Every structure is written in C-alpha cells, then in structure tokens.
Design a protein with these regions (language model features):
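Structural motif
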Residues: 5-7, 130-132, 163, 193
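Short, contiguous strand/loop micro-motifs
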Residues: 25-27, 52-53, 106-108, 138-139, ...
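Glycine-rich phosphate/adenosyl-contacting loop at the front of the ribokinase-like
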Residues: 1-77, 115-116
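Short, well-ordered, mixed-charge alpha-helical segments that flank or form enzyme active sites
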Residues: 14, 99, 111-114, 139-142, ...
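Generic secondary-structure signature for well-ordered alpha-helical cores
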Residues: 12, 16, 70, 74, ...
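Single conserved hydrophobic/aromatic residue that forms the stacking wall/gate
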Residues: 208-216
Length: 216
C-alpha cells in the first residue's frame, strides 16, 4: 500500500442536532474534520499508510482534533502545536426544502499562521509516495499559501507524486487571487482534480488533464 501525505486545516465542526435551525438550538454536536483530513481518513480505511500534516493550538481542543484523526489510524506525528486557535465552522443541517447553512470562524487559526519553521518537510516526505492538498489551504492566508509551496518543493525534492483538488471557495478568496496563487502552485502538480468551474481558475489544458486521467 502507498504512503500518502495530506496537508491542510482540521476544523472543529459545531452542528445543530435534529435538523434544528441555529436560532432553535440549545446545544451543538461536535466533530472534527477538513477536506484533506477526510482524504487521509478514507485512505487509512482502505489500508494505506496515510498521514495528515497540520498545525493545531497547544491546548485540549487541539489535542481532541489530533485524537479524532488517530481513531481512524491516521498518522499524526508531524502535526505542529503552534498558533492561537482551531478554526471553527457552524453547520445548520437542512431539512426538506430548507438548505443547510454554514458559518465559518477560522480567522487567525493555527494553520493560517504556521510557517516552514514549524515543520520538518524533509522528514515528512522521506519514503512517501504521494502528497495531496487542496485549494482550500493556500486560500486560508498568505502564510498558508507560502507554507503549501514549501511543502510542494520538498515533496518534489523527494520524488513524491503530487495531486491537488482545486476546490475553489469564494468565501476564502477571490477568483483573481485564486488564479494567481494556484497558477504558481500548479507547476509542482502531477494530477489535478476539479470541476469545470474550478478549472477556469488555473491555466490547465484539457489535454493535460486527460493525460493524467489515463494514469489513474
């Protein structure tokens, strides 16, 4: 089985129980997750050697997030303890014709302020086969975008294949900022995943995508 590294933000999700609206709820259900973390969990469930790299605050909430990953046999040994807080999002679960709602509270989270100095990327990518990230991580902050590129440089140095899920989030950045940042990061990418709307943000030709599609 492959050794796969994913990197991104793990968040605390507070969701209303029983499809209640925010205004009705007196309590929230607690879960931890994130796009890249969920990929690591899925890969671990399929028997792969999956590791998730992130930063969490050095407090009990941060440790709860790490413990949530360990429950699913995701490697967490390179998670940094730094920064002020874990990002939070509130979920109002939809019901019938009423759609779900999400409210984010992730500004100044640990991963958004983390730097290359908080990680040993040479150690992280030693012996790895694959590195996966999404467009969410570089969208979180300029520091996170820089951190993502440092990770990509280290991954390629160690001969690691790289995949990206473009996953454009308009609440995090503009399409102009996304295009500028992601265009720069695409030079490190072997496999690009995205829908037509996502693909418009970066200059990846259809031929390029098809070439990678045939290798999957």
């Amino acid at each position: 089985m492959a050794k796969v590294i994913t990197m991104g933000e793990i968040m605390l999700r507070l969701s209303t129980p029983n499809n209640e609206k925010f205004i009705q709820a007196d309590e929230f259900d607690v879960n931890y997750g994130g796009g890249e973390a969920n990929v690591a969990v899925s890969l671990a469930n399929y028997g792969h050697d999956a590791e998730f790299v992130t930063a969490v605050p050095d407090n009990e909430i941060g440790e709860c997030a790490v413990a949530a990953l360990r429950k699913y046999n995701v490697e967490t040994k390179h998670i940094a303890r730094c920064g002020e807080r874990l990002g939070i999002y509130y979920l109002e679960s939809g019901s019938s014709m009423r759609p779900s709602k999400v409210v984010y509270d992730r500004a100044h989270s640990s991963i958004s302020t983390a730097t290359e100095a908080d990680f040993n990327f040479d150690e992280i990518f030693e012996g790895a086969d694959w590195f996966h990230f999404t467009g969410i991580t570089p969208a979180v902050s300029d520091a996170a975008a820089e951190l993502t590129e440092k990770a990509l440089i280290a991954a390629k140095k160690h001969g690691v294949k790289v995949s990206v899920d473009l996953n454009f989030r308009k609440k995090l950045w503009s399409s102009e900022k996304a295009q500028k940042v992601m265009t720069n990061l695409m030079k490190y990418v072997d496999v690009c995943i995205g829908n037509e709307e996502d693909a418009e943000l970066v200059p990846v030709s259809y031929t390029h995508l098809r070439a990678h599609e045939t290798t999957l």
